[in-house]
Amino acid sequence: MTKNNEGFTHRNFAAVLQKYKYDLNLGDIVAGTIFSFELNGVLVDIGTPISAYLPIQEVSSNQDLNNFTSLNINDTREFFLLDYNIQSKQLILSIRRLEYIRAWKRIRQLLAEDSLLNVMIKGFNKGGMIINLEGISGFVPNSHLGNFQKSEQFNNKFIKLKLLNVEEKSNNLILSHRRALISQASSNLIVGNIIEGIINQITPYGLFIKVGNLKGLVHISEINIKNLEQISSQFKIGDTIKAVIIHVDKKQGRLSLSMKHLR
């Protein structure tokens, strides 16, 4: 059974519901009981004269569960009222859309609470890490992976993350491992404290220092050198240095260090 509702508007939908005296609206969440399986969908009793229909592609937002294995006869649960099939005169239901709505609601709550999250890694691409949070695909840019080394061996493993940018309308979910690390170590990251770390990157604008699981930056302006050429001659990757914490940016997960302020 398929839908062919081109040009079918919300106003048409409301007229149909009124004609058949359904006390329902497009977008409603309704309770129903599964009573029959068909080839490409499920029949559901939601209290209307004609049974509602749940297409197989609307079973779950999780592609691994987008089949009938998660459903049983006589299961009673909630469904999202998605559409109306003119030919069959059936209301079309969705579990996938309901999961999507509830997932974003939960993500907004996690953002408001600035929660530390334990999230499954789904894979990697050139730009960073792909994750899954509450059934929604998200992304961790390379710049927010900290010292984490990308490798397929970590697929389906869990990593600590914090939300960085959430845009539901564009389905944009950006997270940060760097923020999570800063949050976990925040009690030890006190401005003015001296830390010891290993240089793991030398750039024209400063030194990146590995401090445990964290990565800190000693900007060129915070190094005791007279000219830029000295930075590559004076420092080598793997050198252990001491620096002072001058700023902890918990929002972006940045650790700023200085060698000028060493006593």
Curated annotation (Swiss-Prot):
GO terms for cellular component: chloroplast; ribonucleoprotein complex; ribosome. The keyword Kinase does not apply. It comes from the Eukaryota. It is found in: Plastid, Chloroplast. Residues 27-96, 114-178, 192-260 form the S1 motif domain. Keywords: Chloroplast, Plastid, Repeat, Ribonucleoprotein, Ribosomal protein. GO terms for molecular function: mRNA binding; structural constituent of ribosome. This is Small ribosomal subunit protein bS1c.
